[in-house]
Amino acid sequence: MHIWRIARFTLVAALASFVVACGEDAAEPAAPVVVNKSPNDEREYAAVTLDNGLQVLMVSDATTEKSAAALSVGVGAFSDPMDFQGMAHYLEHMLFMGSESFPEPDGYMNFAAENGGSSNAYTSSEITNYMITIENAAFPEALHRLSEFFSAPILDPGYIQKEKNAVNAEWSMRRESEGRSIYRLQRALLGEHPANRFTIGNLDTLADKDTRELHPATIEFFEQYYSANLMALVLISPLPVAEMESLAQQHFSLIPNKEVDEPVVTTEVNFEEVAGKLIRFKPQRDLREMRLSYIIDNNAAEWRSKPGDYLGYVIGSEMPGTPADKLKSMGLISELMTSSYESLYGNYGTFEISVQLTPQGMKRREEIFDVLSGYIELLRREGVDDRYAEEYRQSLDNRFTFLEKIDDFSYAASLAAAMQDYPIEHVIDAPYRFDGFNQEAVDSLLAQLVPERLNVWYISQEEETNSELEFYVGPHAIEDLEARDIEAALALVNRLGLAQPSQNGLLPEAFDLKETPAEVTSIAVAENVTFWLKGSENFDGLPKGFTRLQLSTDKALNSVENFVYLSLWESLYDLKQARLATEASIAGMSLSMSASNGISLTMSGFTDKQPELLARALEGLRVNPSELEFGQAVERYLRRIENSKRAFPYTRFTPLLGMLTREGRYTDASLALAASKANLEEFTQFVETVLTTSHLRAFFFGNYDEADVRAAYTQLEDFVTPSRSAGYARAGIYNPEPGATLMLNREVPVEDLGMLYGFAAPEASIKNQALARILARHLRVRAFETLRTEEQLGYAAGGGSLDLYQHP
């Protein structure tokens, strides 16, 4: 962690300096640190290090309606004692249970809710982060309450069992998650390395031991690591920086500095023991995935050149001639992704290539492996081209130059976390910083992508397993990875014509701002075809915009078969346009299709090249799949239906509520039956019908003018023939009536249960919507305190509001 000391003259500090200056010349104050911020960011930033070593970043924003704070501690699950795994997470829970000045266990959350705010915290491998947002007037008291988490916590033993139960419930809710299970197994392979911890904790790991009990161990952990010199604080409010600094001094200078060394993982692994494995993993859901997971040395210090991201940029490209493009065209995969986690295990990280397999790909996994490993060998021998450096730099620079604001709660949390990783000057720009292609760093990373550091994962329900995973549901088998002929793999790559990707043609070149209407303006682009245009507050002063083109048809609402065909259309479009979507994403734009009461094509981001993006997007509307591609889309759709049943129960509330209250929503059984009978000929006819008989409308928000709107319609005319008579097709919706009750029960094939209990206002009005949101804020806290904390009936307890066409 980097501690940057900045001299600030509060009254006390100034008096101290005066006394010293009476006897000798006063020392020159250190120059203030300048935090590198986006040119689009008008907020004022300042940093200070309190006398106790606590680093503080203050963000003064005159426009913010609420204040926010976050404090990160540079310790996480990797520092858990082995006899109390989950300790860091459990301590995070206990700190919410009251402090000396505010002893009520529910006082902190109640205070936040009563003042229009919210609070949360999380524990990761190497940090623990606490955050709160609050009405501006309540900000000083919020800081007082938050600071006492660390300066005067009660750690009341009366809440040990309840918080252990809460931690246990959190673990239980996630124990069937494949992502959690795979991550746990990844770390279990590391043996004695500190990353091999059960990070959440449960009743067993947090139980009193013969040698010592949980409560004194908790106090010991707090005293050992919760030191001001390991902490970073972020304050965001409309207050001037000087006033925020005074608040920080007043409340957070009381946190003791124990001069603790930053916890650093240094344990080395024996690659002969932890790598060179084939892991067969049998998931709960019907997945078909293969991963190449390389263990790499931590290269987080190379954040200015980002070798992992740069290499992933090349290997994960969808451009012609790349592995993703070729393997998709062969019908073997539906998706390829790369990821680089520089410090996932502390002193080690991972570089991963993950592919989603088709049924045909499942039969040819070794060939796919040869393509991927052969391509890496090709890059190693040829050297990664530096021609992508400029477009990569430009992509990141554009994002930073026109960086958009996010909510202050999330922003404070992200800055507090970044302060643990980067110099204070670069906590904002570090993710966007690219000082140029670093050949040495890229070559060093490529040299680590070798079989000796590789674990290959086969993830499917077809895997034969012989072991169970501790703490999580994870049947698996581990065997030594058979050696493959790299020269044969390289020959295959050359035979397939694989090469390094071509360059991006969608990067914006012009950033001019256009005159946009402040109010919604309707533009009749053709008979019975109206588009709407409005400047957007979200993109105010930015050369960005959001466009949505909608083709609506009642055919999507009155037939389960048509609903399925729309979903298949969306799936096939996303698959076939993955290359374009990836190219657009790199250029700072997004492209997606969604299906509901028709189809919607959505673009957002920089507006300069959106006409080119739209032209290419429209060319792919008629997806024209082969029989094989269509069959694979149906198979993916059926698997998605089945897999949704194994999702966390609370994540299914929204789609089930939609089925209960809206027309054009169907049961899983009816969707599966319709999909099993789908055929390519009917699908092709349906697509043509939608494109030639539907109602067309479009919305343009942001940096557009009327000429842009009309030009977009001209582009559309070559691909779409909208109906001149059809109206917009809107799904019918349940009209709440006093005394009426709707009830839906579903059995789920997972251990956890869920319940949604809702009330609908019979009168549709904006006023009722606003009142419902206020009520939901208080209900959320009451439900959490009563159902989760006091009665221990569940972990994910809360409340919220949603609208059924203005019915809250």
Over which residues does each language-model region extend?
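Acidic/histidine-enriched alpha-helical segments
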Residues: M109, I154-S172, P240, E259-E273, ...
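M16/MPP (pitrilysin/insulinase) zinc-metallopeptidase core fold and M16-derived inactive scaffolds
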Residues: A30-A31, A68-T133, R197-N202, S317-L336, ...
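M16/insulysin-pitrilysin zinc metalloprotease superfamily fold
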Residues: M97-S101, T133-A166, N347-E404, E561-N562, ...
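Scaffold signal of the M16-like zinc-metallopeptidase fold and its non-catalytic homologs
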Residues: A30, G98-S99, A142, F149-F150, ...
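Mature N-terminal segment immediately following signal peptide/propeptide cleavage
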Residues: S38-A70
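C-terminal motif of bacterial Sec signal peptides marking the signal peptidase cleavage site
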Residues: F18-A21
